[in-house]
Amino acid sequence: MKITQLETLRLGEFPNILWVRLHTDEGLVGLGETFMGAQAVEAYLHEWAAPRLMGQDPLAIEARARDLTGYLGWRGSGVETRGNSALDIALWDLFGQAANMPVHTALGGKSRDSIRVYNTCAGYQYIRSNVNQSSSNWGLGNPSGPYEDLQGFLHHADELALSLLSEGITGMKIWPFDIAAEQSHGQYISAQDLDSALEPFRKIRQAVGDKMDIMVEFHSLWRLPMARKISRALQEFDTFWHEDAIRIDSLDLLKQYAEDCRALICASETLSYKWGFKDYLQTG
């Protein structure tokens, strides 16, 4: 089997998403995807990646990954990495089709029959534009349907928690601190802004008690001093995890943050490649 074509698809309705289709001479087509900076990633794929993939064996996935890793730009999570990630997904999709089995089976099989679900409280228009990752791109103000959960957690988190529980969902992730972080570049949060951001947590606990686990997303917007202050303020609400509370340019800072955080810590969304995860895990 040989790769014959690299096709990319971008939809005007979802300009942040790029779909990648790898065609083969046997008629199989592998599907991959990536998010953010779609136009730049698309250009990289056609300029750099496609010439290195044409005529190659798609089932030799490690060899294809080696061929796509150059000397510049492959340590962080920028355009090259996101493009290669989409290709990796497409290659594994081809592998599963060729083997006539789900990829998870080829990799050793499932370890459980079900997994708990939590709700990321976003809305229909959330980060749909490719402008930026900020509150200005949340798509608030014009609900597009009944499940506008971002507006829900900001203004009636109690009702949202009750609605989720009624559907058997016992975890919800919210990010009420982002607006304050954007105002100060993560360097300061006033007592008033802190109190306002804590209001959704109060409403959830008053409405459903401890029946709902609350996960907190910070989008890597805070500097360490304010992140620690917020973490201490959240202790009374027994939050389940804190996700990307600070930029982890320095993993030592994450370890300092953990000293004030009773919740579990999630911090892998901005990492890339196995080396980034290795360094992260070694922090303990």
Feature annotation, model-predicted:
Residues 249, 253-254, 258-284:
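Catalytic alpha/beta core domains of metabolic enzymes, predominantly
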Residues 23-99:
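Metal- or metallocofactor-binding catalytic centers and their adjacent structured scaffolds
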Residues 114, 119-256, 260:
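Metal-dependent enolase-superfamily TIM-barrel catalytic cores that perform enediolate-based chemistry
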Residues 78-114, 122, 128-131:
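Hydrophobic alpha-helical hairpins/lids featuring a short glycine-rich hinge
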